């Protein structure tokens, strides 16, 4: 960590999570002379949603998450969103592979492991849905290796815990993508920030809180930073600012004063996992098994039983159980939600509250659940689960986007959204899932939008193609490019399956 703070930087990164670390890495690879400073109010990087245990660690390729493939009225399934997320994850794999090849990440097994992704449903209607989904997805080259089975012995071979003790007459179906991954985004964030901190023209400042940000007369930004150790305050100017501060992003967007952020708000959702560290159990489950959310439930309610590999230790995670907290960050304040209310966003927020009563009911139900009720949900996936083998763990806070719509109206968004100033000198990332898995895709979009001059006229595009070989290629269409890059990155990242 740097002891001195430069008064002027080219790029200021606010927040030291996976998003800022990814954007900073790409920018420094494209132009090593860029002067970049990263500010984080906590004492380490990756401590909020990027933290290893604050997210599910799914290499989010839309292999198994059924909320990305909604049914159509005619009985078919819409797979367009799944294909987008699937190929966006390929960009992250390419960036990581480049860093491994360059020696900037020594061993990819420090953050990523092969882990099959499975969808698991029961009941005639759900089985019919999953089979239709499989038929459509496996016909596309992006999912050509997807497997489907209703055979109970086959399912038990793939995931024994979900079958042992189950009613033999229950109608079941699964899909399986053997090439899925488990990603430790906390470890990855540390690896990215470490290699950044070893470069010239990069400053890292922990325990430094950005308390205000305003446009200056030169078109750049004045950033007021407080050293939380000494309580000294500093003024830094930056040509470009990226806010990747998770739940803090709403506050900094509002302080920036950019008109593009007017009317935006946030709706915080807390999460709880059940976690099992017993080797005798975790060693018998090697998959991320996603179920189907109840009709009318929000996307955050999709239950899943996951293998997690963190610091070489295999564990299991089940959940999430959602709840409500007015905090925007785990290390935040209970006043966060109330302090985010402005005249410009109060009507969209009230409109969302009025139109999303089902979400309110769902969250109330989750908050009122007893531990016994929570455990019954686990037993739907793992019938022989025992209370004593599991402990409760608090997940990261997710702040869903409340977005202004027509006059005085608002909509609740469950994805991520990048908001930039008109002159492209300021960007902020709002939202949650799929988040970390598509960090490279988001960073590339920032570069295309906010560094267009450098990309087109200063050689950045050729350098970007060296880092991301399929840049400019639509992997949803080019089957050969898709197969080739997946084989290449699997080899470099040591993800090859038997």
From Swiss-Prot:
Pathway: Carbohydrate metabolism; tricarboxylic acid cycle; oxaloacetate from (S)-malate (quinone route): step 1/1. It catalyses: (S)-malate + a quinone = a quinol + oxaloacetate. Signal peptide: none annotated. One of its GO terms (molecular function) is 2-hydroxyglutarate dehydrogenase activity. It comes from the Bacteria. Its cofactor is FAD. One of its GO terms (biological process) is tricarboxylic acid cycle. Disulfide bonds: none annotated. The keyword Flavoprotein applies. This is Probable malate:quinone oxidoreductase.
């Amino acid at each position: 960590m740097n002891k001195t703070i430069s008064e002027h930087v080219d790029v200021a990164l606010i927040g030291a999570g996976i998003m800022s670390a990814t954007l900073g890495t790409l920018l420094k690879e494209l132009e090593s002379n860029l002067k970049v400073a990263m500010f984080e109010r906590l004492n380490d990087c990756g401590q909020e949603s990027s933290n290893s245990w604050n997210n599910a660690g799914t290499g989010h390729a839309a292999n198994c998450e059924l909320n990305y493939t909604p049914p159509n009225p005619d009985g078919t399934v819409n797979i367009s969103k799944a294909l987008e997320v699937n190929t966006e994850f390929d960009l992250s794999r390419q960036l990581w592979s480049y860093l491994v090849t360059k020696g900037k990440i020594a061993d990819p097994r420090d953050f990523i492991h092969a882990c099959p992704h499975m969808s698991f449903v029961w009941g005639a209607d759900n089985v019919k849905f999953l089979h239709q989904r499989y038929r459509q997805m496996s016909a596309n080259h992006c999912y050509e290796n997807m497997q489907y089975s209703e055979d109970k012995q086959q399912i038990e071979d793939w995931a024994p815990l979900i079958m042992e003790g189950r009613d033999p007459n229950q109608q079941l179906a699964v899909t399986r993508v053997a090439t899925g991954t488990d990603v430790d985004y906390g470890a990855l964030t540390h690896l990215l920030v470490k290699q950044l901190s070893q470069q010239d023209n990069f400053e890292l400042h922990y325990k430094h809180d950005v308390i205000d940000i305003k446009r200056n007369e030169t078109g750049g930004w004045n950033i007021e930073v407080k050293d939380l150790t000494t309580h000294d305050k500093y003024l830094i100017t930056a040509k470009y600012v990226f806010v990747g501060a998770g739940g803090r992003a709403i506050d900094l967007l509002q302080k920036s004063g950019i008109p593009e952020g007017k009317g935006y708000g946030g709706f915080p959702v807390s999460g709880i996992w059940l976690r099992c560290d017993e080797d005798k159990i975790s060693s018998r489950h090697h998959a991320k098994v996603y179920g189907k959310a109840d009709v009318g439930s929000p996307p955050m309610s999709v239950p899943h039983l996951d293998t997690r590999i963190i610091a070489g230790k295999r564990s299991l995670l089940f959940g999430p159980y959602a709840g409500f907290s007015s905090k925007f960050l785990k290390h935040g304040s209970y006043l966060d939600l109330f302090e985010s209310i402005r005249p410009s966003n109060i009507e969209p927020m009230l409109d969302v509250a009025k139109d999303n009563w089902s979400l309110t009911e769902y969250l109330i139900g989750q908050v009122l659940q007893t531990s016994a009720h929570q455990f019954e949900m686990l037993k739907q996936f793992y019938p022989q689960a025992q209370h004593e083998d599991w402990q409760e763990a608090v997940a990261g806070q997710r702040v869903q986007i409340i977005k202004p719509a027509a006059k005085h109206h608002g909509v609740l968004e469950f994805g991520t959204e990048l908001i930039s100033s008109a002159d492209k000198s300021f960007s902020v990332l709002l939202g949650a899932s799929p988040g970390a898995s598509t960090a490279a895709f988001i960073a590339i979009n920032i570069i295309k939008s906010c560094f267009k001059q450098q990309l087109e006229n200063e050689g950045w595009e050729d350098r970007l193609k060296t880092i991301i070989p399929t840049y400019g290629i639509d992997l949803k269409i080019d089957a050969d490019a898709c197969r080739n890059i997946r084989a290449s990155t699997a080899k470099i990242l040591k993800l090859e399956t038997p």
